[in-house]
Amino acid sequence: MSLTNEQIIEAIGQKTVLEVVELIKAMEETFGVTAAVAAAGPAAAAAVVEEQTEFNVMLTEAGEKKVNVIKAVRELTGLGLKEAKAVVDGAPAMVLEAVAKEAADKAKAALEEAGAKVELK
C-alpha cells in the first residue's frame, strides 16, 4: 500500500517539532542528502544586505530558573513537557525558526523574563 503525499503531510503535521527534526536527520542519513539549501553565487550576498524579515530564536542558556524557562518554551512552541524539557536541557537549542521580527522579539522577551539567555539569528 502506497501513501499519498497528502497522507504523508498529514502524518508529519501531527508530530512535534523535535520529532520532525529527528525525522529529517533520519532521512538525511538514509538517503545520503542534506536539508541545507545550496549556496547561490553573488546574488545571495546581495540579498543578505536587505533587511532580515525572518528570525530564529536560539536558547543559549537556561539560567537559574529552569522550570520557568520550560514553561515559557511550552507556551511559545506548543511542545509537551518532555519535549520542552529536552529543548531546555539541550541548550544551546533552536526554540523557533523563521518567525517574524515581532514574534521573535516577543519570544525573546518571554524567555528572558523566565530567566533564559536568548539570541535572535
From Swiss-Prot:
GO terms for biological process: translation. It comes from the Bacteria. Keywords: Ribonucleoprotein, Ribosomal protein. GO terms for cellular component: cytosolic large ribosomal subunit. InterPro entries: Ribosomal_bL12 (IPR000206), Ribosomal_bL12_C (IPR013823), Ribosomal_bL12_C/ClpS-like (IPR014719), Ribosomal_bL12_oligo (IPR008932), Ribosomal_bL12_oligo_N_sf (IPR036235). One of its GO terms (molecular function) is structural constituent of ribosome. The keyword Glycoprotein does not apply. The keyword Ribonucleoprotein applies. PANTHER family: 39S RIBOSOMAL PROTEIN L12, LARGE RIBOSOMAL SUBUNIT PROTEIN BL12M. Homodimer. Part of the ribosomal stalk of the 50S ribosomal subunit. Forms a multimeric L10(L12)X complex, where L10 forms an elongated spine to which 2 to 4 L12 dimers bind in a sequential fashion. Binds GTP-bound translation factors. Belongs to the bacterial ribosomal protein bL12 family. NCBIfam families: L12. Forms part of the ribosomal stalk which helps the ribosome interact with GTP-bound translation factors. Is thus essential for accurate translation. This is Large ribosomal subunit protein bL12. It comes from Pseudomonas fluorescens (strain ATCC BAA-477 / NRRL B-23932 / Pf-5).
